[in-house]
Amino acid sequence: NDFPEIKKYIEHLKNETKKTGYAETMLGRKRFFDLESIRGNGFLEAQMERMAVNAVIQGTDADIVKLAMIAVHKELDPQKIRPILQIHDELLYEVADDMIKEAVPRIRRIMEGVYKLAVPLSVDIKIGKSWGSLLKYES
C-alpha cells in the first residue's frame, strides 16, 4: 500500500463507528448506525463500514462547501453575486459582468480559507455566459 497512513485512518474510522454507533465528520456532524440490527451479519457490517468511511469523507466535504456558501454570502453583495446551484463540491454563481474581476479572487480566497486542513484546499473557477460555455478563469 502506497498510503499506509490513509489505511490506518480508515481502520480508525471503522473501529470508532463500531464502538460508538456513529461516524462523525471533521466539523462534528454525526451519522448514526443501528449496530444491533447488523451484528453478526458480515455483509451488513462491511456495508456499514463503507458507509461510515464515506459519511466522514463526503460529509466533511459537504460541511466545508456549506461553510464556503455562507462565507461568500456574508462577504459579497448578494444583489450582484447570486448562488444558483450546488452540485456535490461545486458551486454555481451568477455574477454581474462588472463584478467578475473583483468577485473571482475574493470568492477563491474565501473558499480556500474557509476551513483549515493539513493539506491546502484548491479552488478551480470557471466563467461563462452559460453552463455549457464555461472556461477556466485565469486571474
Segments the model singles out, each with a brief description of its role:
Residues 1-139:
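Conserved catalytic core of nucleotide polymerization and phosphodiester-bond processing enzymes
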